[in-house]
Amino acid sequence: HVCLEVDDVYQAIIELKDSGVEVLNDIPKIGAEGFKVIFIHPKFTGGVLVELAERPA
């Protein structure tokens, strides 16, 4: 599993979906240290689970 930090997880969801990429959760969950997180479906990332995380304000 790989985690990448993004500035705006909601914008990332929109951009991914507009590009035809499936995310596992449309609504971010609160992860470690309060980060908002989503996951990209592994079928779009060569079998790797990719997490996108937005730092808490």
Question: Where does each model-flagged region fall?
Answer:
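Vicinal oxygen chelate
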Residues: 1-57
